[in-house]
Amino acid sequence: HMRLVDATRGIVKAEDLARMKPSALLVNTSRAPLIEPNALVEALRAGRPGMAAVDVYEKEPLRDVSEPLLTMDNVVCTPHLGYVSRDEYEIQFTDIFDQILAYAAGTPANVVNPDVMSRRR
């Protein structure tokens, strides 16, 4: 998994996909915008990579049944829950709870922009 931030948006380019083997399988259960817009559909149509499994889409929630990825024989699509397991939920919610407790205690963890902490009211 890769987080979606400005530096990772579109990090996978069409030329990266074109270098994949026809036998390659691209799996994206992270964030669709990590891949350059429309690049995956075009690459799959060109046969490089030959297959994809996706759990995330450029437009979510996905309501358009004519979405190209949904109509392709070489793509497996799941409804943005492909990563979900009981263990994953327990890990995720334990971490969230621990972070809330740390924040309430005045010792927040994983602060991406620590300068805002000096502006706390």
Regions found by a protein language model. Name each.
Residues S23-R121:
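Rossmann-like dinucleotide-binding domain for NAD(H)/NADP(H)
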Residues H1-I11, N28:
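Rossmann-like NAD(P)-binding element
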Residues I11-E15, I96:
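Charged helix-capping and loop-helix junction motifs
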